[in-house]
Amino acid sequence: MKFCHVLKCLLALLLCTTVFAQPQQVVVGVSGNGYVTRQQDGARITQRGVTHWTNPKSIVSIYFYLHQPTTADLSLYAKGHSEIKVSYGKKGFKVNLQSDDFTKVPVGSIDIRQAGYVRIDLQGVSKSGESFGEIKQLIADNVTGKSNYVKDFSDYWGRRGPSVHLGYALPEGDTEWFYNEITVPKEGETMHSYYMAAGFGEGYFGMQYNSPTERRILFSVWSPFDTQNPKEIPDDQKIKLLRQGKDVHIGEFGNEGSGGQSYLKYPWKAGNTYKFLMQIRPDGNGNTTYTAYFYATDEKEWKLIASFLRPKTNTWYKRPHSFLENFSPEQGYLSREVFFGNQWARSKEGKWSRLTDATFTHDATASAQVRLDYQGGNTKDNRFYLKMGGFFNESVPMGTKFYCKPTGKEPEIDWEALKQL
């Protein structure tokens, strides 16, 4: 009887292994997994896939993740009249497109020798018309093992890549101030990134890389009124400006909740460390003030960004956190990284406490496992780091806890000078 039970278990295991090892077809949509990685003005990624593909110097790269080595027979679901080159590493295939309608076009077989992200490049060689054609899907047949890529998920969010966060543990009691230091390493400096240093339950405060000619220090507070349109907020629930720093722009924002926004155009530099100081204090009348200060390391002075009043709110500092995100879907193939160090909290009584514990979390893009290029952790010099994008292979599980040694000394702040800003 016992032998029969063991035999049944072995047969079941063999059946599961056989089913799991069955070759599969992986259909990778270009609209969610493709990028123009060279000469971006010569092709576009749209809901139809690769379109407006006119420049032979443009390269379109398609990414997907495989969990084990395998061979794969590649095809394209494409249309057009042209010759294109399809490359995997050093192996290239010349492919002729000869159809006005979308059809499956064989490419060739590749040998994928290790688990991780696979990159397939497309480049135009010659064309009979204005365009090299349109590519809707990359198809990989006879693949063994599991795969991950943007599928049954928003192309927009999938192409942006996963946002990653660090939540810091506060001491007991009421916290009024949060202090954090941020450094963007040269290798992590990527346009359209938000390196957020001092987040809180009702908003955030950090640095952005907006364009080749513009960088910002951004501070935003959400309204207590839940809407995506700031024009819908009733007057008694609007964020009110109390103080404004020199050269700081004040406005509204929407699409992810609505509220008050402020930013200072400031040419922060990769490799330099900048200080962020955030105050949250109830006013005793059912409202709370939020005040953000930025230490301009290059000028060696504190700057006031803004002070806002949030109505119908009675809170001290809650949920201090940092995050890293890419806000351009065209840039999701590039990696970005940031270091955070020397975190301190100051109680309403004026006592500083060194914060040493952080918890790593991520957004829905990572939770859905459509992107696996997300990380957080410790640096060798006792700081925390966040990294995302660029299709690297090593990810960190949601909820992983990190610890840094309680080194450093409490921030030296001239409180009276801050009040005069």
Where are the regions that the model predicts?
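Extracytoplasmic
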Residues: Q22-P267, K275-P282, G286-L421
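Bacterial Sec-dependent N-terminal signal peptides
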Residues: M1-P23
